[in-house]
């Protein structure tokens, strides 16, 4: 009877040990999975990465021919944007460049620790830093037109610091760092889009055009129309106005207008004025933290994400069917628009080349880093396989047995 009881206890003890060993092994494998395979997705068939990690961006053109020389420092745009510090993104919104869509991306589509608070019926969102009630974004949809409607580079650089000092007085103890960004668009498409917008009644007459501490006089900036707006104007009428701010708008809004006497056209000769404006716009564009092109939405998204180390929740969409795209114009009219926007044509050609070179540089750098990581992982895997197994000289030991159960068994 005692032998049966002793034998029963032995069987129970062995069964308990086996259950403990199996449970411990399962826990060990789960822990090992967490450390060894964090990049795998249980929900993705075939071990593929989840959709967020798939490469949504176009492959760089290997046959792209560079037009301009840019040093590496102009192609490297990897900033340490400190949202919890005193850094501020300032969006320079040029009319009819897709800035409204991009501006909404900034307040509604960026993956943030503390998302912007956008409430129905309100035109502005509250974009506070994660650690305090201060804004990290200066834009139409966050701070409104605080420096005037569609303020340009000259206005923003002189206005933004003061506006934020008044809004966030507690931040006066440390200087802010401003990161200017903008979007550019093909000049002909942008010009036609602005004409259609004006034709529907838009005026932007509340824009300040502040420069050197004052607004332009009526003599310096005469209106193109009489009355409240220019609705119903024909394309020919739009092109015939010599004071139309749509002409070379992108260069004017990116240049330092103080260099040419602001809107005083008699300050310097016309040819020299044009050259100074173009060179200033190129310089300021290069100095910006980021700029995108309306015609390349996915590449614009890619460069913004890599520049600021921020991720968008949803990918950008390329919409080629715009109001400007529906306008039928003949070749003579297109040439006329190109002549009226000659400075913008030169700037866009320059910007497009810089944009493409930055994209290619970033993609090649990223691919190179991926290859290096893959090579290191393969070498590490081979090194682990080459290590001798320490438990190979202990026959009879169950592979899934943990250390404590092995010691108990020896007792």
UniProtKB/Swiss-Prot annotation:
Catalyzed chemical reaction(s): alpha-D-glucosaminyl-[heparan sulfate](n) + 3'-phosphoadenylyl sulfate = 6-sulfo-alpha-D-glucosaminyl-[heparan sulfate](n) + adenosine 3',5'-bisphosphate + H(+)
Catalytic residue positions: 150
PTM characteristics: N-glycosylated.
Tissues with expression: Expressed in fetal brain.
Transmembrane annotation, as ranges: 18-37
Effect of residue 306 to W: In HH15; with anosmia; results in Kallmann syndrome in the presence of FGFR1 mutation Gln-250; approximately 50% reduction in enzymatic activity compared to wild-type
Coiled coil region boundaries: 352-387
Variant or mutagenesis effect after changing residue 306 to Q: In HH15; 15 to 30% reduction in enzymatic activity compared to wild-type
Residues reported in the UniProt entry to bind substrate: 123-124, 140, 145, 150, 197, 204
UniProt EC number: 2.8.2.-
Pfam family, one: Sulfotransfer_2
A biological-process GO annotation: lung alveolus development
Organism superkingdom: Eukaryota
UniProt-listed InterPro entries: Heparan_SO4-6-sulfoTrfase, P-loop_NTPase, Sulfotransferase
Record topology, Cytoplasmic segments: 11-17
GO molecular function list: heparan sulfate 6-sulfotransferase activity; sulfotransferase activity
Effect of mutating residue 404 to V: In HH15; with anosmia; 30 to 70% reduction in enzymatic activity compared to wild-type
Glycosylated residues in this chain: 264, 320
Principal subcellular localization: membrane
Lumenal compartment spans: 38-411
Disorder cited: Hypogonadotropic hypogonadism 15 with or without anosmia: A disorder characterized by absent or incomplete sexual maturation by the age of 18 years, in conjunction with low levels of circulating gonadotropins and testosterone and no other abnormalities of the hypothalamic-pituitary axis. In some cases, it is associated with non-reproductive phenotypes, such as anosmia, cleft palate, and sensorineural hearing loss. Anosmia or hyposmia is related to the absence or hypoplasia of the olfactory bulbs and tracts.
Function field: 6-O-sulfation enzyme which catalyzes the transfer of sulfate from 3'-phosphoadenosine 5'-phosphosulfate (PAPS) to position 6 of the N-sulfoglucosamine residue (GlcNS) of heparan sulfate. Critical for normal neuronal development where it may play a role in neuron branching. May also play a role in limb development. May prefer iduronic acid.
Record protein name field: Heparan-sulfate 6-O-sulfotransferase 1
UniProt source species: Homo sapiens
Gene (name only): HS6ST1
């Amino acid at each position: 009877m005692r032998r049966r009881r002793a034998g029963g206890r032995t069987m129970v003890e062995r069964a308990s040990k086996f259950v403990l060993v199996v449970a411990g092994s399962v826990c060990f494998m789960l822990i090992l999975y967490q450390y060894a395979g964090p990049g795998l997705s249980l929900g993705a068939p075939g071990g593929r990465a989840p959709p967020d990690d798939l490469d949504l961006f176009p492959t760089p053109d290997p046959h792209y021919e560079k037009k301009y020389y840019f040093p590496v420092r102009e192609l490297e745009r990897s900033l340490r944007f400190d949202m919890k510090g005193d850094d501020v993104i300032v969006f320079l919104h040029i009319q009819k460049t897709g800035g409204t869509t991009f501006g909404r991306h900034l307040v509604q589509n960026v993956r943030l620790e503390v998302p912007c608070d956008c409430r129905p019926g309100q035109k502005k969102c509250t974009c506070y830093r994660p650690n305090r009630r201060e804004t990290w974004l200066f834009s139409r949809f966050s701070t409104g037109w605080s420096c005037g409607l569609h303020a340009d580079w000259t206005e923003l650089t002189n206005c933004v610091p003061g506006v934020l000092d008044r809004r966030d007085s507690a931040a006066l103890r440390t200087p802010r760092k401003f990161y200017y960004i903008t979007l550019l668009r093909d000049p002909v498409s942008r010009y036609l889009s602005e004409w259609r917008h004006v034709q529907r009644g838009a005026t932007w007459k509340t824009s300040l055009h502040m420069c050197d501490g004052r607004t332009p006089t009526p003599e310096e900036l005469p209106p193109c129309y009489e009355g409240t707006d220019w609705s119903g104007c024909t394309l020919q009428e739009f092109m015939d106005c010599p004071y139309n701010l749509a002409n070379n708008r992108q260069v004017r809004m990116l240049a330092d207008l103080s260099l040419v006497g602001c809107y005083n056209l008699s300050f310097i000769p016309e040819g020299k004025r044009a050259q100074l404006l173009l060179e200033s716009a190129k310089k300021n564009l290069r100095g910006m933290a980021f700029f995108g092109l309306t015609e390349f939405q996915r590449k614009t998204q890619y460069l913004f994400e890599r520049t600021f180390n921020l991720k968008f929740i949803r990918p950008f969409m390329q919409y080629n069917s715009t109001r400007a795209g529906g306008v039928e114009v003949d070749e003579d009219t297109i040439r006329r628009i190109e002549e009226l926007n000659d400075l913008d044509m030169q700037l866009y050609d320059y910007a497009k080349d810089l944009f493409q070179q930055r994209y290619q540089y970033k993609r090649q750098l990223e691919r190179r880093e991926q290859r290096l990581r893959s090579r290191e992982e393969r070498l590490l895997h081979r090194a682990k396989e080459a290590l001798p197994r320490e438990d190979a000289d202990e026959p009879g030991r169950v592979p899934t047995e943990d250390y404590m159960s092995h010691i108990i068994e020896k007792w």
